[in-house]
A protein has these predicted regions:
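Flexible "arm" and connector segments at domain edges
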Residues: 1-70, 75-139
Length: 139
């Protein structure tokens, strides 16, 4: 606690944290003082609301407002993860690794076929992507 005893609830969350982790910590602090969903299932209405607002701003092609709404959407998804005791940072790391593995699968096939990625159609790449995905499910 600060020496003057006038500490704010969210003041202990460092600004230097990566945004995803900072969002999780801010939500934890708010929860600790009772600012939380009574029923965690209700969070999905908020996630959908934020997604709708993002889509609306994207249609308007307003980059500033779209960026703001993207942040709101991401914050709500991170909040949902917290409510379901899921670590959003770990989840994103796993997804990044899946993307790398699947893309590398496409690239490996392009090398074997002596066909540069830039000469492959999206359909060909999608087909290989789905093969990579199926191979993951077999393991």
């Amino acid at each position: 606690k600060e020496k003057d005893g006038n500490k704010r609830v969210l003041s202990g969350v460092p600004d230097a944290l990566p945004s995803l982790i900072q969002a999780s910590r801010l939500q934890d602090k708010a929860r600790n003082v009772g600012f939380d969903w009574e029923d965690r299932g209700d969070v999905w209405k908020k996630v959908r609301e934020e997604l709708d607002e993002l889509e609306e701003e994207l249609r308007k092609e307003d980059k500033e407002k779209s960026t703001e709404e993207l942040g709101d959407f991401l914050f709500s998804v991170i909040n949902a993860a917290r409510l379901y005791h899921l670590n959003p940072d770990n989840a994103l790391e796993r997804t990044n690794q899946k993307f790398i593995n699947r893309f590398n699968y496409i690239e490996d096939h392009s090398i074997k076929a002596c066909k540069p990625l830039t000469e492959m159609t999206l359909g060909e790449m999608d087909e290989l992507w789905n093969e990579a995905k199926q191979n993951e499910n077999i393991k």
